[in-house]
Amino acid sequence: MKRLAVLIVTAGLFLSNVSGALATPPSGVTTVSIGKARFVDDIHARVRTDVDPGTRTDFWQAVIDTKGASDLEVIQNTIAPGGSFGWHSHPGPSLVIVKSGTATFYLASDPTCTPHVVQQGQGFVDEGGDVHIVRNQGTVDLVTVVASLIPAGFARRIDEPNPGNCSF
């Protein structure tokens, strides 16, 4: 029995080291933290705004609901041409603004490796939990501003192995 326990622990350590070795770290990326705050209580924010007072059905709505303490971090990333964030995921949602350049992202769950292109002045939502990569396939720096809401104390980025669905 003792031998089986040692074997299980050894296998677990081996697998954890292999998964770390298979991770795809960022390249050509510089990140600056703009600010970080801990929200110790649940967040329940709901707003409904009448965007066309003459029409009873034109409302814009937003909901943020968390259970447990949360961290909100705002960062700015600069990605050199040819650089990428590497394959990764997040434990919570992020709102991403493309400040300059062009972001191209790919999802690990997409067997066709379809590029999703986001231009300067546009944004996108990373809902969290999905494995993806963001690349700068342009000729100028890509600058993004990201607001991430995650469980308190968690790392905002989780390195992931290359899923093998893209040729790069």
Segments predicted by a language model, with ranges:
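A short, N-terminal "cap"/entry segment at the start of jelly-roll beta-barrel domains
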Residues: 4-7, 13-71, 115-117, 161-168
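Short acidic-glycine-tyrosine-enriched beta hairpin
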Residues: 79, 109-129
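Histidine-centered divalent metal-coordination motifs
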Residues: 88-90, 132
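Glycine- and acidic-residue-biased ligand/ion/polar-headgroup-sensing regions
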Residues: 90-111, 120
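Ligand-binding loop in jelly-roll beta-barrel domains
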Residues: 119, 128-155
